[in-house]
Amino acid sequence: MRPVVPRGVILLLFASLAVASSNLDWVDGLGGKIERDAAGNVIAVNLRGTWVSDSELLDLARLPKLERLDLSHTRITDEGMLYLKPATGIRELNLYYAEQITDQGMSAIKDWKNLKRLNVRGTRISDGTLAIAGGLTGLESLDVAYTEITDSGLDALVPLTHLKELSIGRSKLGGNELEVLRLLTTLEYLDLGGPHPGAGGKTETSVSPLPASVPCAISELKELRVLKLAYSGIGADGLRILSSLDKVEKLALEGCSHVNDQALTELAQWKSLKFLDVQETKVTPQGVAALEKARLGIVILSGDAGVVH
């Protein structure tokens, strides 16, 4: 005989769920946004750039259908992240420049097996978070640029056989990283670009030419469609090696001091190239015109003012 659940208990359960979903007036008060599905369940919360507190994240952890959470440019701490540990249904987490987050807080997501997209760019995470990410084998997009990760920590990413997008920044281009890159053959988007030399009060310095080992490693990623190498030492020789990437449609080379008209000549051989950013490089209007003639329909962003051709 099946046990009978009192009607009052059922009503209480539904009421508690309703309260969890509806008691989010503070999100609007902070200037955030909420998205619901057809049944009224909260499936996405955007708190980008708000003054959300750690304790307020407890309300979000109680949302059973929450899939997307944007906490970018907030001041939440590791304590707030740990409050989110029960939110295992989250598929997309954006912590872009949530600058107080470290590996300790990121331990909250180690059991989030549904997570597909993770952005921790500009946080204080290091190799511990890479190890956690490596255990989330369903990840499709990962941004760890401008963090404290090291070259050796990237080994943890090898199990990510579904990874399509990776951003790590140019500062981690060591030998170990190159070996890891060669194994990430599912990548369609790769960002190895560095920051603008003047960003964060830094003075402009010259960038050494990129060793041939770097483009050689990248050239093995045959599924790439977007490649970003901004403010790196890539030049004509490296672009010649990369011309074997016949699916790349978008190439970002802004601020690359070794990119000149000779480099543009090499790009004429790129079979699928549709968009090119060569702002703040040494290309000339004549070189740009020649590439446009060779690659009909290509969109080129050039010059210090970002002129579109």
Label each PLM-derived region with a short phrase.
Residues 27, 38-40:
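Short, surface-exposed loop/turn motifs at beta-strand boundaries within globular domains
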Residues 19-32:
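Surface-exposed cap/linker segments adjacent to membranes
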Residues 15-17:
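N-terminal signal peptide c-region/cleavage motif recognized by signal peptidases
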Residues 31-36, 299-301:
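Short secondary-structure junctions
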Residues 1-10:
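Bacterial N-terminal signal peptides that target proteins for export
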Residues 285-288:
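Short, surface-exposed alpha-helical segments at coil->helix boundaries
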